[in-house]
Every structure is written in C-alpha cells, then in structure tokens.
Amino acid sequence: MDSQKEALQRIISTLANKSDEIQNFIDTLNHTLKGVQENSSNILSELDEEFDSLYSILDDVKESMISTIKQEQVRKSQELQSQLSQCNNALENSEELLEFATRSLDIKEPEEFSKAARQIKDRVTMASAFRLSLKPKVSDNMTHLMVDFSQERQMLQTLKFLPVPKAPEIDPVECLVADNSVTVAWRMPEEDNKIDHFIMEYRKTNFDGLPRVKDERCWEVIDNIKGTEYTLSGLKFDSKYMNFRVRACNKAVAGDYSDPVTLETRALNFSLDNSSSHLNLKVEDSCVEWDPTGGKGQESKIKGKENKGSVHVTSLKKHTSGTPSPKRTSVGSRPPAVRGSRDRFTGESYTVLGDTAIENGQHYWEVKAQKDCKSYSVGVAYKTLGKFDQLGKTNTSWCVHVNSWLQNTFAAKHNNKVKALDVPVPEKIGVFCDFDGGQLSFYDAHSKQLLYSFKTKFTQPVVPGFMVWCGGLSLSTGMQVPSAVRTLQKSENGMTGSTSSLNNVTQ
C-alpha cells in the first residue's frame, strides 16, 4: 500500500511538472503570437514610411529636373528672341536703304546724285545688317537634359529586406558561474563578417528550464558587446537561477535571440530575524545596531499599571544613562511584560540570529563591523541556543569575537573556551560553513587569509548568529563560496585550529 502511494505520488508530481511545463509553453506561444501581430503591424508601418520617403525623394528630384529644363527653355528662348529682334531691325533698315538706293538711280542731276551716293555709302557703312551674326546663339538641342533611369530602375527592382544576422548559439559548457560572477560564451552558426556587435540580456528567476513569459522580473540589457563572451561580476545571487539570451546586430538591424540558457546561481540568502532579537538591538534585513534605549517606549506604557513598575523604570534609567558596559545591563532592568514577543534573547546576550537554517551543503557570507563598534561576535549556533546564552559560551555555538572596549582582543570561542588569534582584525570577516564536512572557518574577506577554523560534527541544523554591543554590523549574503576559499579548504585539513584546541584553554 505504501509503495503504491509513493509511486502514485511520483506520478502526480510528474504530471504536475508536465502540466506546468505545458502551461509555460502555452504562455510562450500566446506571447509569441501577440508579438508577431504587433511586430508585423510595426514593420508594415515602417515599410510605408520608407516607401513614402522614396516617393518624396523622387518627387523632389522630378520637380528639380523639371525646373532645370524650364530654366533652360527660358534661357534659350530669350537668346533667340533677342537675336530675332536684332535681325528684324537690321532687315528693316536694310530694306529702307535698298529702296533709297534704288530711287537714287533715277536722279539726273550730277550733284544731287553724288550727294545721294555719299549718303548711301555712309549708311551702308553704318548698317547693322553688316555687323550682325547670322548664326543662332543657341541651338534647339535639349538632349543634354535627357535622362536614363534604367540603372536606377534596376536598383529599385533589387530592393529587398535587410539581411538579418542569424541567432547566436550559447555554449553552456563554456559558461562559468564562480565568485558571484557569470561568464556567458556563444558562437555564430556560420561566419558573418558584417556583425557589428552583440546584445546580451539576462534576468534572475527561481524556475529551472525555459524562461517563463510571466516571470515577474524584467530582462536586463547589456549592449554593444564586441566579442563572443561577456562576464557579469559583482552579482548578488538572490535567486536560484539566471536566464541568458544573446542576439547579433549588424549596422542596420538586430537578429533573433539565441535559445535561452538557464544557469544555476544558488547561494545562501538570509536576513536577520528581527522578531526574535534582543530588545537592545535595532535590526533590519541586513544590518543590526546596538540601541541602549531599546524598549523604553514600551516600558513607559506599563508605568503605573504594576505596583513595582516605578521601581523597574528607575532601575532602568540608572543602568541606561551614558554608555553602559554589557556587564551592567541586566535582565532585571526590564520587566518581562515589556519584551512581548521579542524575548528570544535577553540579559547580556545581545544576539540576533539569521532567519534561515543550514541543514546541508557549503555556504559563505560576510560581515562588516562599524568602525566604532566596541564588541561583536560572528558565528553559528543551534536553534536551541538559550535566551541568556552568548555566542561561543555554550557547546551549541561557535564564533570569533572582537572586543575593543577595555583592551583589544580577537579570539575564537566555543563551549566557554577561548583561543586568542594572533592576526589583525580584518575590515570584513568571511564565514564559511561546511555543514556536511563539519567545518566552520573564518577568513579575511578581502585577502581570503584563513583566520581560524573549527572542526566538529553538527548534529542539528545551525543558523548564522551575531552579537553586537556599542556599534553595528552589516551583512552580505547571496554569495557563492569564493574560489580562493575552496582552494584553501582543499589544502587545509582541519589541523589549523579546531575545537579540540579550545578544550584546554580557559576563558
């Protein structure tokens, strides 16, 4: 019966996954169909605009050429009209002179004839007919303004759609995810020397397989990539996967997207649990700050409602004036009713835990303290850590502790044992937890120098733990285990600092 139920559950799970996959594909088809309709409409509009632009250019050129022909016609006509007018005047003068000369032949008197002859000679000498060119200044030839658009017609007949680059092919084998960086590599299916650049798009997702159309996150765009490889660095891996796609572009147009590739980007993401922290801690998702006035507003509300309320408030004021040390602030200074739901830690345990438990695998996160922070601890603990317990003072917690209040100390702590660390306190501490391997190591986050390493066997899930007094801490999560740390872990066999080295060291 049980085996049949398990088999049925597997079948149900398989069917559910297949249904989800088909639904995602249906969404993709609908999205693609909508895109085809919208893009076709846009392309038709662009085509109309292009042809209208051609028509406009042709009309402009036609008008310009017509104007040139008409101007040439006017010029030649004016030249010929001017020459024609001159010829008519010369002809008229010549005919008058001819008539006068003909009449002079009939003169009988010698003196009068001689006078007429001299006049005719002078008029002939001055006659415009003898100075006039009888060659037209312009010809009627207009062939220099003829056109032959056969070549242009051939060019117009060769109009076609732009050559579109083929879709690139992303090579998952060549892609690399390491050190919170992702390198994506691709190639063209065939050589294309007209490609100018590539566009890569990516988005984060929590779904494996093909990208989902209804994914809440938008595609981010990296443009003008000249090579066939690109690296995104400095990422926060706050999702399980990332989708990538690439398209090639020539000088005019972008081609189709490559088939999308989904790369795994798992990393430990957690926030600080504000609901269970000490009341003297001001907690946000990724930072915690010590607040000596924490809970005062709530205490004032209950003042006068209890017989001993005034005593508690007076005691609290004495202890919170100035900057008290951890030893001077006690649980008795705040009535239990004030803490309400935030009584997970109290007394001198200025503790806040992460909201995500570690049950397996290797994980890494980093912590940075404020410059004026007096005291803080960073490590892990079982969920059973007591409300009065401080990190490192029980057998259920491991940490490194920094104190600069009375004297500067840097130590590893576990089970109320202390191991002084003879290394400078780094600006930022990296925490590496190998749950299955039973190892907790601390590093200088910048240089990746190993500070200390605990070797143990975790019997319960652990949660990141933090203590802070007079100062604050900021947290960086969503980080992969750095390559340098992985390399050091392979060479470091747990011999450098272990819990056994703390057994004989008193606090």
Curated annotation (Swiss-Prot):
SMART domains: BBC (SM00502), FN3 (SM00060), SPRY (SM00449). InterPro entries: B30.2/SPRY (IPR001870), B30.2/SPRY_sf (IPR043136), Bbox_C (IPR003649), Butyrophylin_SPRY (IPR003879), ConA-like_dom_sf (IPR013320), COS_domain (IPR017903), E3_ligase_FN3/SPRY (IPR050617), FN3_dom (IPR003961). Residues 321-332 have a biased composition (Polar residues). SUPFAM superfamilies: Concanavalin A-like lectins/glucanases, Fibronectin type III. It comes from the Eukaryota. Residues 298-309 have a biased composition (Basic and acidic residues). Residues 70-109 form a coiled coil. Residues 291-484 form the B30.2/SPRY domain. This is FSD1-like protein. It comes from Mus musculus. The gene is Fsd1l.
